[in-house]
């Protein structure tokens, strides 16, 4: 009973926010459709690339000749997206982007209109950005609840980051919606991922790990408890406990190890991270993870849940900004199926991540960052992928 009451406020908050967001989106649907029809009308008619054939079957967003999406493939890909985000607190938006841009072919499709119909190019690009964020938003909500129940979420730190993230999540859609071409989006997307991957690679070196004694000690204590097969209740009891709360300093313990952070620094970090994440059309977890491990000094076992809480707030604000303030459209049939997959993957991730050593969670992060970064830097800035699929 006490546990249920403990998580009730978070559940109610998430459902209220999602309800308000959904209501607002229904109101602006007609405006979004009008923008799409106007962009299609300005596109040259024909059967060549960069042209619209009115007689072709309707595909993505109802555009004649656009890719026809396989909803089952969307479901399966979303399970992977939900699992990876809920396991490491990052790469949900990036993997959603890989699916929408590459697996479904929306990236190459949008590129065909680069010169013939810039308005349609940018409209599809914005749609991809928001679609990514819908998937990450739900995964973040589910992951936050799961990790909170497990005692693996630092709520004060997540809230401080979220407060700062609100400004960035509002500002970027207003400044960039309808102004970013697909090629530039892909290039910047990959560059940001590649840089962060290199940063996390350094943290995996002996020199990088030597600076994180508290995180290493806490991770070892947690891993020892898992090997001893302690019950879920015992693990939760040794989880996050806030011992001191102040405007400039917050302290908490995790498996007997004490940690400290400055909420003001966290809020400032959240502002810049959310701004970049909103521009890239992703959740920002791949930026929050290095912030939480390097600046806050947390072990990976606390990073996923704390990152998820912050990402959830940023995603709600950013989706609202894109779809309500800038009338961006999404393919609701695809999003609906993908959200089912996200739910499945996000329920599995927190339950499997505890069996993966802390260092291997970081290494998984690095491998994915290098692959995704190389692919989109090369495709965005050089016109061809250096890694498969080419």
Where are each of the predicted segments found?
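Transmembrane helix-bundle signature of multi-pass membrane transporters/permeases
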Residues: 99, 129-136, 162-166, 304-315, ...
């Amino acid at each position: 009973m006490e546990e249920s009451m403990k998580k009730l406020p978070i559940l109610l908050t998430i459902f209220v926010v999602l309800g308000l967001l959904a209501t607002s989106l229904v109101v602006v649907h007609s405006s979004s459709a009008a923008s799409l029809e106007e962009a299609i009308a300005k596109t040259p008619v024909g059967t060549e690339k960069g042209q619209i054939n009115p007689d072709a079957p309707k595909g993505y967003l109802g555009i004649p000749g656009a890719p026809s999406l396989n909803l089952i493939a969307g479901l399966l890909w979303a399970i992977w997206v939900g699992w990876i985000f809920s396991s490491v607190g990052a790469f949900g938006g990036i993997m959603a982007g890989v699916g929408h841009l590459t697996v479904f072919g929306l990236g190459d499709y949008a590129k065909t209109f680069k010169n013939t119909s810039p308005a349609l190019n940018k409209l599809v690009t914005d749609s991809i950005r928001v679609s990514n964020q819908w998937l990450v938003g739900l995964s973040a909500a589910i992951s936050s609840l799961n990790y909170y129940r497990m005692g693996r979420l630092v709520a004060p730190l997540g809230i401080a980051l979220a407060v700062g993230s609100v400004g960035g999540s509002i500002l970027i859609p207003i400044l960039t919606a309808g102004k970013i071409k697909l090629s530039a989006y892909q290039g910047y997307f990959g560059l940001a991922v590649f840089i962060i991957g290199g940063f996390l690679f350094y943290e995996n070196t002996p020199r990088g790990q030597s600076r994180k004694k508290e995180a290493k000690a806490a991770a070892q204590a947690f891993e020892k408890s898992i090997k001893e097969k302690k019950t879920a209740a015992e693990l939760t009891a040794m989880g996050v406990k806030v011992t001191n709360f102040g405007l400039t300093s917050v302290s908490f313990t995790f498996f007997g190890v004490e940690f400290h952070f400055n909420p003001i620094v966290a809020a400032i970090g959240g502002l810049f991270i959310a701004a970049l994440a909103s521009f890239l059309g992703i959740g920002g977890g791949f930026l929050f993870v290095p912030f939480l491990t390097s600046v806050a000094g947390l072990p990976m076992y606390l990073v996923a849940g704390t990152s998820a809480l912050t990402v959830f707030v940023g995603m709600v604000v950013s989706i609202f900004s894109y779809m309500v303030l800038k009338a961006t459209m999404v393919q609701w049939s695809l999003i609906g199926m993908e959200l089912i997959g996200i739910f499945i993957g996000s329920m599995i991730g927190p339950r499997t991540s505890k069996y993966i050593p802390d260092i291997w969670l970081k290494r998984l992060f690095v491998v994915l960052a290098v692959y995704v970064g190389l692919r989109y830097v090369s495709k965005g800035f050089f016109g061809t992928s250096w890694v498969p699929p080419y």
